[in-house]
């Protein structure tokens, strides 16, 4: 999974916890 602070997409669930849709980071 992606480490916290990594850029992510709100539609993908590859973060360790969750993706922030506003900052687009885990």
Curated annotation (Swiss-Prot):
| Entry protein name | Omega-conotoxin TVIA
- Originating organism: Conus tulipa (Fish-hunting cone snail)
What does the organism's lineage look like at the top?
A: Eukaryota, Metazoa, Spiralia, Lophotrochozoa, Mollusca
One term of GO molecular function: toxin activity
Where in or outside the cell?
Secreted
Q: Quick check: keyword Heme in the entry?
A: no
Check the record and name the SUPFAM superfamilies matching this protein.
omega toxin-like
Q: Which domain of life is it from?
A: Eukaryota
UniProt main location, coarse: secreted
């Amino acid at each position: 999974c992606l480490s916290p602070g990594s850029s992510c997409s709100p539609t993908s669930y590859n973060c360790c916890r969750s993706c922030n849709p506003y900052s687009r980071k885990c």
